[in-house]
C-alpha cells in the first residue's frame, strides 16, 4: 500500500497543495509521497 492510498477521495493531496499537513493513517505523510507531487 503506497502512502496516501487510504485517502482515496484525494482530500489528502488537496490539503497538501493547500500547504496543510496531512496524515493518511500511516507513518509516512502522503504530502511527502511522489503520488502527491
UniProtKB/Swiss-Prot annotation:
Record bears the keyword Protein biosynthesis: no
SS bonds (residue pairs): 12-16, 22-36, 24-31
One MF annotation (Gene Ontology) recorded for this entry: toxin activity
Function according to Swiss-Prot or TrEMBL: Inhibits ADP-induced platelet aggregation in human whole blood in a concentration-dependent manner (IC(50)=89.5 nM).
Organism: Crotalus morulus
Name assigned to this protein: Disintegrin morulustatin
Subcellular localization, as worded in the UniProt entry: Secreted
Cellular-component GO terms for this entry: extracellular region
Expression sites by tissue: Expressed by the venom gland.
Coiled-coil intervals: none
UniProt keyword Disulfide bond present: yes
Family: Belongs to the venom metalloproteinase (M12B) family. P-II subfamily. P-IIa sub-subfamily.
Anything else known: The disintegrin belongs to the medium disintegrin subfamily.
Keywords: Cell adhesion impairing toxin, Disulfide bond, Hemostasis impairing toxin, Platelet aggregation inhibiting toxin, Secreted, Toxin
Broad class of where this protein is predominantly found: secreted
